[in-house]
Amino acid sequence: MKVRRFAGVSARERDLVVRMTKRCLRELCKKEHELPVSYAEACEALTLTVKARSERSSGCRKGITIDVSAYRAGARTLLEYPAFASDRLIGSRVDAEPIAVLWGTVAHEVSHFIQYRYGPDTRWLAKTYRRAHGEGFRDIYRILRARVVNPLLGVESGVGTRQSAEP
Protein backbone atom coordinates (compact mmCIF):
# COMPACT_ATOMS: atom_id res chain seq x y z
CA MET A 1 0.00 0.00 0.00
CA LYS A 2 1.38 3.34 -0.98
CA VAL A 3 0.50 5.92 1.69
CA ARG A 4 0.58 9.67 1.10
CA ARG A 5 0.14 12.06 4.00
CA PHE A 6 -0.61 15.71 3.30
CA ALA A 7 0.79 18.50 5.47
CA GLY A 8 -1.13 18.95 8.70
CA VAL A 9 -1.95 15.27 9.17
CA SER A 10 -0.29 13.68 12.19
CA ALA A 11 1.47 10.33 12.01
CA ARG A 12 -1.09 9.01 14.51
CA GLU A 13 -4.00 9.99 12.24
CA ARG A 14 -2.26 8.48 9.23
CA ASP A 15 -1.57 5.22 11.06
CA LEU A 16 -5.17 5.06 12.29
CA VAL A 17 -6.53 5.39 8.74
CA VAL A 18 -4.00 2.82 7.45
CA ARG A 19 -5.15 0.29 10.09
CA MET A 20 -8.81 0.95 9.25
CA THR A 21 -8.16 0.54 5.53
CA LYS A 22 -6.29 -2.72 6.06
CA ARG A 23 -9.09 -4.07 8.27
CA CYS A 24 -11.67 -3.31 5.56
CA LEU A 25 -9.53 -4.92 2.86
CA ARG A 26 -8.91 -7.96 5.04
CA GLU A 27 -12.65 -8.47 5.44
CA LEU A 28 -13.42 -8.11 1.74
CA CYS A 29 -10.56 -10.38 0.62
CA LYS A 30 -11.89 -13.38 2.55
CA LYS A 31 -12.62 -16.38 0.32
CA GLU A 32 -16.35 -16.21 1.05
CA HIS A 33 -16.59 -12.92 -0.88
CA GLU A 34 -15.02 -14.43 -4.02
CA LEU A 35 -12.94 -11.41 -5.03
CA PRO A 36 -10.31 -12.30 -7.64
CA VAL A 37 -7.50 -10.90 -5.47
CA SER A 38 -5.63 -11.73 -2.29
CA TYR A 39 -5.31 -9.35 0.63
CA ALA A 40 -1.64 -8.73 -0.22
CA GLU A 41 -2.47 -7.93 -3.86
CA ALA A 42 -5.28 -5.56 -2.84
CA CYS A 43 -2.96 -3.74 -0.44
CA GLU A 44 -0.29 -3.49 -3.12
CA ALA A 45 -2.75 -2.01 -5.63
CA LEU A 46 -4.18 0.65 -3.31
CA THR A 47 -2.84 4.17 -2.90
CA LEU A 48 -4.06 5.76 0.32
CA THR A 49 -3.99 9.54 0.68
CA VAL A 50 -4.75 11.09 4.07
CA LYS A 51 -5.49 14.81 4.24
CA ALA A 52 -7.01 17.39 6.58
CA ARG A 53 -8.49 20.08 4.35
CA SER A 54 -12.21 19.98 5.14
CA GLU A 55 -12.90 18.45 1.74
CA ARG A 56 -14.69 15.31 0.64
CA SER A 57 -13.16 11.88 0.88
CA SER A 58 -13.16 9.81 -2.31
CA GLY A 59 -12.46 6.39 -3.77
CA CYS A 60 -11.62 5.18 -7.28
CA ARG A 61 -9.92 2.22 -8.97
CA LYS A 62 -6.45 3.52 -8.05
CA GLY A 63 -7.03 4.20 -4.39
CA ILE A 64 -8.80 6.24 -1.74
CA THR A 65 -8.46 9.70 -0.22
CA ILE A 66 -9.61 10.19 3.36
CA ASP A 67 -10.08 13.64 4.89
CA VAL A 68 -9.69 13.49 8.69
CA SER A 69 -10.99 17.03 9.36
CA ALA A 70 -14.43 15.83 10.51
CA TYR A 71 -12.80 13.29 12.83
CA ARG A 72 -10.64 16.03 14.35
CA ALA A 73 -13.67 18.26 14.82
CA GLY A 74 -15.50 15.47 16.64
CA ALA A 75 -18.20 14.83 14.01
CA ARG A 76 -20.87 12.54 15.46
CA THR A 77 -23.05 12.00 12.38
CA LEU A 78 -22.34 9.46 9.66
CA LEU A 79 -24.07 10.96 6.64
CA GLU A 80 -24.80 8.83 3.59
CA TYR A 81 -26.13 9.64 0.14
CA PRO A 82 -29.92 10.19 -0.09
CA ALA A 83 -30.34 7.06 -2.22
CA PHE A 84 -29.60 4.85 0.78
CA ALA A 85 -29.58 7.22 3.78
CA SER A 86 -32.67 5.54 5.26
CA ASP A 87 -31.44 1.96 4.69
CA ARG A 88 -31.45 0.02 7.97
CA LEU A 89 -27.99 -1.47 7.44
CA ILE A 90 -26.03 1.09 5.40
CA GLY A 91 -27.92 4.29 6.08
CA SER A 92 -26.96 7.44 7.97
CA ARG A 93 -26.41 7.36 11.73
CA VAL A 94 -26.59 10.15 14.29
CA ASP A 95 -24.96 10.40 17.71
CA ALA A 96 -22.05 8.11 16.85
CA GLU A 97 -18.55 8.36 18.25
CA PRO A 98 -16.17 10.34 15.97
CA ILE A 99 -13.94 7.30 15.47
CA ALA A 100 -16.96 5.24 14.34
CA VAL A 101 -17.82 7.99 11.84
CA LEU A 102 -14.25 7.80 10.50
CA TRP A 103 -14.62 4.00 10.24
CA GLY A 104 -17.77 4.56 8.16
CA THR A 105 -15.97 6.98 5.86
CA VAL A 106 -13.05 4.61 5.32
CA ALA A 107 -15.40 1.67 4.67
CA HIS A 108 -17.38 3.76 2.16
CA GLU A 109 -14.27 4.70 0.18
CA VAL A 110 -12.73 1.21 0.33
CA SER A 111 -16.03 -0.05 -1.11
CA HIS A 112 -15.56 2.29 -4.09
CA PHE A 113 -11.98 1.07 -4.58
CA ILE A 114 -13.07 -2.58 -4.61
CA GLN A 115 -16.08 -1.76 -6.79
CA TYR A 116 -14.10 -0.09 -9.56
CA ARG A 117 -10.86 -2.09 -9.29
CA TYR A 118 -12.27 -5.62 -9.01
CA GLY A 119 -15.95 -5.29 -9.94
CA PRO A 120 -15.51 -6.20 -13.62
CA ASP A 121 -13.72 -9.44 -12.68
CA THR A 122 -15.94 -10.51 -9.79
CA ARG A 123 -18.82 -12.87 -10.58
CA TRP A 124 -21.39 -11.24 -8.28
CA LEU A 125 -20.39 -7.65 -9.19
CA ALA A 126 -19.79 -7.89 -12.95
CA LYS A 127 -23.28 -6.70 -13.92
CA THR A 128 -23.80 -4.12 -11.17
CA TYR A 129 -20.46 -2.46 -10.42
CA ARG A 130 -20.60 0.53 -12.80
CA ARG A 131 -22.95 2.97 -11.03
CA ALA A 132 -21.18 4.96 -8.29
CA HIS A 133 -23.71 4.23 -5.53
CA GLY A 134 -25.62 1.50 -7.33
CA GLU A 135 -26.32 -2.06 -6.28
CA GLY A 136 -22.74 -3.29 -6.73
CA PHE A 137 -21.39 -0.61 -4.42
CA ARG A 138 -24.17 -1.18 -1.91
CA ASP A 139 -23.48 -4.93 -1.82
CA ILE A 140 -19.81 -4.32 -1.00
CA TYR A 141 -20.62 -1.58 1.52
CA ARG A 142 -23.20 -3.82 3.22
CA ILE A 143 -20.47 -6.37 3.93
CA LEU A 144 -18.23 -3.76 5.54
CA ARG A 145 -21.01 -2.05 7.47
CA ALA A 146 -22.40 -5.34 8.80
CA ARG A 147 -19.09 -6.88 9.80
CA VAL A 148 -16.80 -3.95 10.59
CA VAL A 149 -18.58 -0.61 11.13
CA ASN A 150 -22.05 -1.29 12.56
CA PRO A 151 -20.79 -3.31 15.54
CA LEU A 152 -18.88 -0.14 16.52
CA LEU A 153 -22.06 1.90 16.18
CA GLY A 154 -24.00 -0.52 18.35
CA VAL A 155 -26.30 -1.37 15.43
CA GLU A 156 -27.75 -4.88 15.30
CA SER A 157 -26.58 -6.44 12.06
CA GLY A 158 -26.85 -10.09 12.91
CA VAL A 159 -23.08 -10.31 13.18
CA GLY A 160 -21.53 -10.11 16.66
CA THR A 161 -21.92 -7.47 19.33
CA ARG A 162 -20.57 -4.00 19.98
CA GLN A 163 -16.77 -3.91 19.71
CA SER A 164 -13.99 -1.44 20.46
CA ALA A 165 -13.69 1.32 17.85
CA GLU A 166 -9.88 1.20 17.84
CA PRO A 167 -8.57 -0.91 14.91
Regions found by a protein language model. Name each.
Residues 2-101, 117-167:
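Metalloprotease/metallohydrolase-associated module, dominated by Zn2+-dependent proteases
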Residues 104-117:
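Active-site recognition of the HExxH zinc-binding catalytic motif
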